[in-house]
Amino acid sequence: ALARAKALDKGAIKGLLHGLPIGVKDLFDTHDLPTSYGSSIYADNYPSTDAVSVALMRQSGGIILGKTVTTEFASFKSGKTTNPHHSQHTPGGSSSGSAVAVGDFMIPLATGSQTAGSIIRPASFCGVVGYKPSFGKISTAGVKSLAPSLDTLGCFGRTVEDVALGIAAMSGDHELAKVSDLHNKVRIAICKTPEWQYACPETRGALAIARFS
């Protein structure tokens, strides 16, 4: 990573992520770092190529600083990750390490994947911006699959602008880096699932206030 940073310092701007250190969820193949998919079974697995999204981030000047913890195969046993704001609270999963690394100011950007709630959940638990784009927007080639009909790639950052850069680089669609101001209030639908009864009073209160503001 340091060698790449020095090389980038000497050259012309390569792209949207020039010189930015990036964390890569340990479901994404990386040719120069082990990819274990969160499992001891693949502890010594070194892929021969990068996942497509990782390759695109490198082409945009990003520096892959390391791999971030994921639950095993994005679904099973959780990894050793601690919520950056409260050591006794869960960081959420399965993209737990990426959300924690951004939330704890280790890195400005990190990749994630979501089949059910694996980006938006850890983002909310760790107080960072997590974005899951539309299905198929970012190529999943080179990423361990959980459910191909649902798997979607995204990323984490501390601001919407940072995440927009990450998504633009990962997808190869640099138009996505443009962030527009909202001129009208956003309408958000809330689906109260059976688990709603377990929401704490603070959560219920915050949503009630947001509903009328």
Describe the role of every protein-language-model region:
Residues 33-37, 66, 147-148, 188-193:
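Short beta-strands and strand-loop turn motifs
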Residues 1, 163, 188:
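Residue-level signal for inorganic ion chemistry
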Residues 14-17, 58, 102, 182:
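Extracellular/periplasmic catalytic domains that process cell-envelope and extracellular macromolecules
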Residues 49-167:
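Short glycine/serine-rich loop segments
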Residues 5-12, 58-61, 132, 139, ...:
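Structural signal for hydrophobic packing residues in well-ordered secondary-structure cores
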Residues 46-53, 206-212:
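Short catalytic helix/loop segments, enriched in acidic residues and glycine
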Residues 172-213:
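Gly/Ser-rich, acidic/histidine-flanked active-site/gating loops
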Residues 1-46, 74-75:
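Short, well-ordered alpha-helical
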